């Protein structure tokens, strides 16, 4: 039992160990905003009026200032002290020798240069020259020299034009000016654990105290940065910027996201998105019965007022008259549907919704800094926490107590959020009922109902205010204590120190993450870790917490200066002398501070419990009825659940077989109906009533134009087969064959069937050469009357196959359009179809966005459990890991899913889902390009017609990516997939299973080639190419023999053909033709040009088809090689050769003619 607890705690420590991305963390860093500012720009971003006078845009930090002291620090960097030239460490730049890849690194020449020095120590002396007076160039600039920030005026854009980039509107300050003149200094810990002086600025808007008018005017203004130079093309390097205070934290907060989501759903975001509350409110006041009731109440009220005045029942003073007129006016507004919501929202409801949000924002701003929860769980805080484990005997106890406190704080904050959301929803419900209760204010007998309604509204509005004021107050106590206790610097150290083994991992870990160090094993340790006053340094620094001076002046964080230890900036030298003494003596654990945290947690829990009753007391309502009703309802639901359990069980047992039978019956008729509808669609595709929109979709998605389809091809093919079967010389046993069945086969299948019937062979390939010649003689002979309409069986089969492909494409295009929401009217009305298509694209984008959002959470959790699993394996070994896995590491993420034919783990399924989303995004891109050109951009025909090589490469790249996914999907489908889960292949797959996978890969490769909609067209273009080649060869031979030349070029052929027709003997002409010489020349030249065009076009298409077949083959071989790699790792022999594609590369016409010499 004790061992289980120890392993659980140890794995928790490994899993929660913070990864901040830095080698060392500053003492006051509990989650600062950090980013890099590069000294280089893309050439397209830089403009120049003349050579050497470039201007670059300002970089938007994506943060807005909040009017409090803006404290920005630039990290120091010293190569000679051990800092590395990597994007994670570099904080310097060089104005010389930079290359295009030096956005985040220094040029090699600049790495070892010394920092720049300026004449008289001033970078910008007065009067300011054009160039900084550097006296040791070339050199590197550090500590913020050359870096400026800009607080832009509200509504202005500093990057609107080159002039605005040079002279932006707002506040600009240089971060590289020496801060010694300001009576304070910035210090930061380097990657080697040394405290170095850093650059930076503490800007307080020129105010003696904050807040002030100028600070308020610039609150929520955008913050920009830029390294100022006059020539950026040879710059290299970057600055690492740390924003310590003065900006609104826009980093994601899950609880804030949840509250905003519900609030926007209830109250909307704009007039176009009104929200549930406003919609319900509008529906109530727009109801005719309600308007009639309000009119009747107003009429009665006016009548009673007049009657009471006449009989002297009321004393109509000026005040009473004004009150009654106001009541009538307010209730009368409810009759105006267009103004009712605007009036009551702007003058009443806004105080309970927007006013509540503003008050909560004021409370949060008053607490300053980051939220309590983000501070407690930030990587920097956790890194400092876990650094106590090996430096103090009480470190382990402190960590456990801290985690327990964190758990309770999270529960309390979550509970407070639920209370706030409940209050928000209740306020929405109360506002929804406003049209009813506002009418109750007219009469004395119903006035109490209106007053109670208003009290409830006030009560639920006060609840969150009281709650979050308490959280902010107690949260400040906890934050102050955490900062004081963990306010020291930490650095990563190799732990355990493996000596020479660390060198093995050094280069690998540096490429992976420069912050890891020389080993994949590390831990955080405090700096300085050893006690002694000599390791601590005092200096005048900005106090990083809210602070009260000796004279009673209140200061915000980073507003005032005080002398403190730079290693312990949160501790006052006098007030916190005992804690400072403990740190100097090497005692880092402060248990008294932890006691204060637990006391604060207890107070916070009590405050949560009393917030609702306090708000109810203030508003004058008890608030007990809702709680009693909730308890009664929960008790009732629990009892009824127990009573109904046996009844529900008996009902389920009886209804299960009935439901199964109904489902099977419904499925049977549904399949029959679907088959009937699909058959009707295929027949409709060949009729004159075919839908034009679907035909255009077929052309756009499948590359088949209905104008190229012979609608009678199927009948012609069937007639050709019948005619051939009637020839008893050809097929003595032809009567045994079914013509209808043969008409569904392609030419290759039909030839195999004839070979089997005539010779008794297995297929055509097994015939002898003489038998093949005899069979080909009959099958390739023209079956029609001599002339243009006469075609061989091969041509008829090709046309019929093309027509069947068109029918299938029409059917699937119709189905896809229906799936995208394009209904019957949309298929016939262009405007409606465009609208429905746009809605489908928007829906698809939303679904992909939602899937990505869900996948991010799943991926984070999968990675988290994977980290725990790896940690457990490293500690206890694989065998013991399997024993503890079920309870400790969420094994379901890593176990096989036996319902999955691929036997993947859940984490592997997540990766495949991510690939599926990538396929959807890729398909959306392909659809967009297809829609633009109104053709199938992936078809070999379209690629053959393209003229620009860049377009061909772009579309081929899209097609290649799509084809890889198609092949992988084909290899993953079925009950015996080729692609299995990685863990199964590594640990469980047997020799027989892997052999079966490779055999299936060969089989699926053949099926894919045969069924692919593009490769199926090869026969059609083979025929076109052979006919064109045959005609060209015959013409070329005639010209060659006539002119006795062997060097005829393609461009000479039209002229030589014309000359040949003029010189041709009269005896060679057909007596039946009476064409003139000019007509004969025109026809001969035209025929040659058509044949040449068909030759080139068919050759290009066939080459594209061969490339597609080769790509399919390569991807299948990749998966076979993957399986053989697993076999090799398992010490199994390699099995079966890769799939081969006996492809060909057709020559261009010029090369073909040259080869005929």
Curated annotation (Swiss-Prot):
Localization of this protein: Cell membrane
Record's keyword annotation contains Transmembrane? yes
Q: Write out the transmembrane intervals.
A: 292-312, 394-414, 423-443, 458-478
Question: Which is one Gene Ontology cellular component term of this protein?
Answer: plasma membrane
List residues with covalent lipid attachment of type N-palmitoyl cysteine: 19
**Signal peptide coordinates:** 1-18
InterPro entries, from UniProt? Conjugal_tfr_TrbL/VirB6
- Do the record's keywords include tRNA-binding? no
The way this protein sits in the membrane is described as:
Multi-pass membrane protein; Lipid-anchor
Choose any GO biological process term that the UniProt entry carries and state it.
protein secretion by the type IV secretion system
Report residue spans for region: Disordered: 1134-1157
Q: According to the Swiss-Prot or TrEMBL entry, at which residues is a lipid covalently attached (S-diacylglycerol cysteine)? A: 19
**Basic and acidic residues bias: start-end ranges:** 1148-1157
* Keywords from the named record: Cell membrane, Lipoprotein, Membrane, Palmitate, Signal, Transmembrane, Transmembrane helix
Q: Report the sequence similarity comment from the record.
A: Belongs to the TrbL/VirB6 family.
What name has this protein been given in UniProt? Uncharacterized lipoprotein RBE_1261
Q: Which organism is it from?
A: Rickettsia bellii (strain RML369-C)
């Amino acid at each position: 039992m004790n061992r289980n607890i120890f392993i659980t705690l140890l794995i928790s420590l490994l899993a929660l160990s913070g990864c901040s991305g830095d080698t060392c963390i500053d003492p006051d860093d509990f989650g600062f905003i950090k980013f890099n500012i590069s000294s280089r720009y893309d050439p397209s971003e830089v403009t120049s009026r003349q050579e050497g006078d470039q201007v670059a845009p300002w970089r938007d930090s994506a943060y807005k200032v909040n009017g409090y002291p803006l404290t920005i620090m630039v990290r120091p960097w010293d190569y000679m002290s051990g800092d590395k030239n990597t994007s994670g460490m570099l904080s310097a730049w060089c104005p010389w020798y930079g290359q295009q890849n030096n956005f985040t690194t220094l040029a090699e020449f600049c790495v070892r240069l010394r920092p720049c020095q300026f004449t008289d120590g001033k970078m910008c002396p007065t009067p300011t020259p054009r160039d900084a007076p550097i006296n040791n160039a070339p050199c590197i600039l550090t500590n913020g020299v050359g870096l400026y920030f800009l607080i832009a005026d509200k509504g202005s854009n500093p990057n609107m034009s080159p002039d605005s980039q040079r002279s932006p509107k707002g506040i600009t300050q240089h971060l590289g000016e020496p801060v010694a003149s300001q009576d304070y200094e910035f210090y930061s810990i380097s990657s080697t654990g040394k405290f170095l002086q850093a650059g930076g600025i503490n800007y307080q808007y020129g105010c003696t105290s904050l807040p002030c008018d100028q600070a308020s005017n610039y609150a929520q203004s955008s913050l920009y940065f830029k390294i100022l130079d006059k020539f950026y093309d040879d710059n290299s390097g970057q600055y690492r910027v740390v924003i310590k205070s003065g900006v609104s934290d826009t980093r994601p907060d899950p609880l804030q996201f949840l509250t905003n989501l519900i609030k926007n759903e209830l109250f909307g975001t704009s007039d176009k998105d009104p929200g549930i509350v406003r919609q319900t409110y509008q529906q109530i006041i727009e109801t005719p019965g309600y308007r009639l009731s309000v009119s009747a109440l107003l009429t009665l009220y006016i009548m009673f007022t007049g009657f009471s005045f006449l009989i002297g029942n009321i004393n109509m003073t000026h005040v009473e008259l004004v009150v009654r007129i106001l009541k009538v006016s307010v209730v009368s507004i409810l009759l105006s549907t267009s103004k009712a919501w605007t009036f009551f929202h702007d003058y009443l409801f806004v105080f309970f919704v927007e006013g509540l949000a503003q008050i909560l924002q004021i409370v949060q701003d008053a607490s300053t800094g980051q939220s309590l929860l983000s501070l407690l769980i930030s990587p920097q805080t956790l890194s400092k926490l876990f650094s106590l484990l090996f430096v103090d005997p009480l470190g382990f106890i402190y960590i456990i107590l801290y985690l327990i406190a964190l758990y309770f704080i999270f529960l309390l904050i979550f509970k407070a959020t639920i209370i706030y959301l409940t209050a928000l929803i209740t306020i929405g419900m109360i506002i929804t009922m406003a049209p009813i209760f506002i009418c109750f204010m007219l009469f004395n007998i119903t006035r109490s109902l209106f007053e109670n309604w208003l009290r409830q509204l006030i009560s639920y509005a006060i609840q969150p205010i009281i709650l979050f004021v308490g959280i902010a107050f107690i949260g400040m106590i906890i934050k102050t204590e955490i900062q004081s206790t963990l306010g020291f610097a930490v650095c990563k150290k190799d732990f355990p120190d493996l000596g020479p083994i660390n060198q093995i991992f050094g280069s690998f870990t540096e490429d992976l993450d420069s912050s890891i160090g020389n080993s994949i094993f590390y831990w955080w340790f405090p700096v300085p870790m050893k006690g002694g006053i000599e390791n601590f340094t005092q200096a005048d620094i900005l106090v990083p917490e809210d602070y009260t001076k000796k004279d009673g002046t209140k200061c915000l964080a980073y507003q005032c200066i005080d002398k403190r230890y730079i290693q312990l900036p949160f501790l006052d030298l006098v007030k916190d002398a005992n804690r400072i003494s403990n740190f100097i003596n090497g005692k880092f654990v402060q248990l008294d501070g932890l006691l204060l945290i637990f006391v604060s947690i207890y107070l916070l829990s009590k405050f949560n419990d009393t917030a609702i009753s306090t708000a109810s007391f203030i508003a004058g309502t008890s608030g007990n009825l809702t709680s009693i009703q909730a308890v009664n309802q929960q008790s009732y639901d629990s009892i009824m659940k127990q009573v109904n359990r046996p009844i529900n069980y008996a009902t389920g047992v009886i209804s299960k077989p009935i439901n199964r039978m109904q489902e099977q019956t419904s499925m049977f008729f549904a399949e029959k109906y679907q088959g009937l509808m699909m058959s009707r669609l295929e027949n409709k595709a060949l009729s004159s009533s075919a839908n034009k929109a679907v035909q255009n979709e077929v052309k756009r998605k499948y590359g088949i134009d209905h104008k190229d389809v012979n609608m009678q091809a199927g009948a012609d093919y069937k007639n050709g087969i019948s005619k051939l079967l009637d020839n008893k010389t050809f097929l003595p046993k032809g009567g045994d064959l079914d013509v209808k069945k043969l008409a569904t086969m392609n030419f290759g299948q039909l030839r195999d069937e004839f070979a089997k019937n005539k010779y008794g062979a297995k297929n055509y390939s097994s015939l002898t050469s003489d038998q093949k010649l005899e069979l080909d003689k009959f099958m390739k002979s023209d079956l029609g009357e001599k002339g243009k309409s006469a075609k061989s069986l091969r041509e008829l089969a090709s046309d019929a196959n093309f027509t069947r492909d068109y029918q299938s494409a029409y059917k699937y295009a119709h189905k896809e359009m229906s799936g995208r929401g394009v209904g019957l009217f949309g298929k016939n009305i262009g405007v409606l179809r465009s609208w429905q298509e746009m809605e489908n694209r928007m829906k698809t984008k939303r679904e992909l966005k939602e899937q990505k959002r869900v996948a991010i959470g799943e991926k984070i959790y999968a990675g988290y459990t994977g980290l725990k699993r790896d940690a457990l394996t490293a500690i206890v070994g694989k065998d013991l890991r399997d024993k503890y896995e079920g309870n400790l590491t969420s094994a379901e993420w890593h176990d096989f899913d036996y319902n999955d034919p691929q036997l993947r783990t859940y984490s592997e399924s997540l990766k495949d889902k991510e690939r599926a989303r990538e396929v959807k995004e890729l398909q959306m891109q392909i659809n967009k390009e297809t829609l633009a050109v109104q053709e199938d951009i992936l078809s070999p025909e379209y690629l053959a017609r393209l003229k620009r090589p860049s377009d061909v490469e772009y579309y081929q790249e899209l097609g290649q990516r799509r084809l890889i996914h198609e092949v992988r999907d084909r290899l993953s489908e079925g009950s015996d997939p080729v692609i299995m889960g990685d863990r199964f292949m590594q640990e469980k797959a047997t020799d027989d299973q892997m052999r079966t996978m490779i055999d299936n890969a060969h089989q699926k490769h053949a099926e894919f080639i045969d069924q692919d909609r593009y490769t199926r067209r090869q026969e059609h273009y083979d025929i076109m190419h052979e006919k064109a080649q045959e005609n060209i060869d015959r013409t070329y031979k005639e010209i060659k023999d006539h002119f006795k030349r062997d060097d005829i070029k393609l461009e000479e052929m039209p002229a030589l053909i014309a000359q040949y027709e003029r010189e041709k003997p009269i005896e060679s002409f057909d007596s039946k033709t009476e064409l003139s010489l000019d007509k004969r020349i025109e026809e001969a030249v035209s025929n040659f040009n058509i044949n040449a065009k068909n030759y080139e076009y068919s050759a290009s298409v066939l080459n594209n088809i061969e490339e597609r077949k080769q790509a399919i083959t390569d991807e299948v071989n990749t998966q076979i090689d993957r399986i053989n790699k697993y076999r090799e790792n398992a010490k199994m022999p390699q099995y079966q050769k890769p799939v081969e594609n006996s492809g060909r590369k057709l020559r261009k016409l010029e090369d073909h003619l040259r080869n005929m010499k």
